[in-house]
Amino acid sequence: MIAHQRLIASDGYEVCLFPLSYLYMSQDEGGDYSHAGTLCIDFLGWGANGRVYNCDYYAPCTCKLVNSTLDPASNMRVWESVAPVHLPDGTLDYICFQFGHDNNPPYSTVGTVVTQGELIGHTGTAGYVTGDHLHYNVARGNYAGGERVPPNNNFQLKNSIHIYDANYVNDTVIVRGFNHNWRTYGGPTPPPPVPPTPFGKGDFVVMFNNISRTKRKEVNLWRA
């Protein structure tokens, strides 16, 4: 999504959008590192000219701050939608977001409400990190706290879901999406899931969404 963007379906409910203008994954969910057993993903700040540090990201939907003390060292913030929102898995539900590593979070007071598309944070290096990024986790429903999961006792929100099932990527440029099933919203009814294109190893994909948000064009950006 882009700054100040709002997307409201014909039924009056917001469409949940991906919080960054460029999608560049640096660590996937699961695996054998700090995300083992979780559905958390790390994203780099990115722009038309490459890496962006302290990169702005925006409220995926209108949401309220429900926890600002989950991990003080990493400045974790948990937000909950103020109403049900449309999700790429075809459901309408409440949703919670955990954002981490912002060195200067703009909000700390529980109960603060931020409108969809407004600034909600920045990529950063707060806490135990190896570089500037956004640590992102999404959970379905109202905020229910967190949990430690095997095999490494890593933390995630309870009722976590895949980020690509929670955020549409309208007006987001996909630079490195690990071939996950990222989808755009064409409203008023969320489209069915589309199988990911089988790109070869080393292929990066860029997805351009036009202003109507109903069409998309995928091209190979470059082949390693």
For the regions a language model picked out, list residue spans one by one.
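Short, surface-exposed polybasic-aromatic patches that bind anionic ligands, especially phosphate groups
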Residues: 220-224
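Short glycine/threonine/proline-enriched tight-turn/helix- or strand-capping micro-motif at secondary-structure
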Residues: 20-61
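A structural signal for short beta-strand/turn segments enriched in small hydrophobics and glycine
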Residues: 25, 63, 111-123
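Polar, enzyme-active/binding microenvironments
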Residues: 9-25, 34, 67-72, 116, ...
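Active-site scaffold segments
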Residues: 40-43, 116, 121-122, 133-139
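Residue-level detector of conserved, well-ordered beta-strand and adjacent loop positions
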Residues: 26, 44, 80, 100, ...
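Acidic, glycine-rich catalytic/binding loops that coordinate metals and/or anionic ligands
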Residues: 2-16, 47, 51-52, 109-115, ...
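Zn2+-dependent peptidoglycan hydrolase active-site motif and core
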Residues: 52-54, 58-107, 126-140
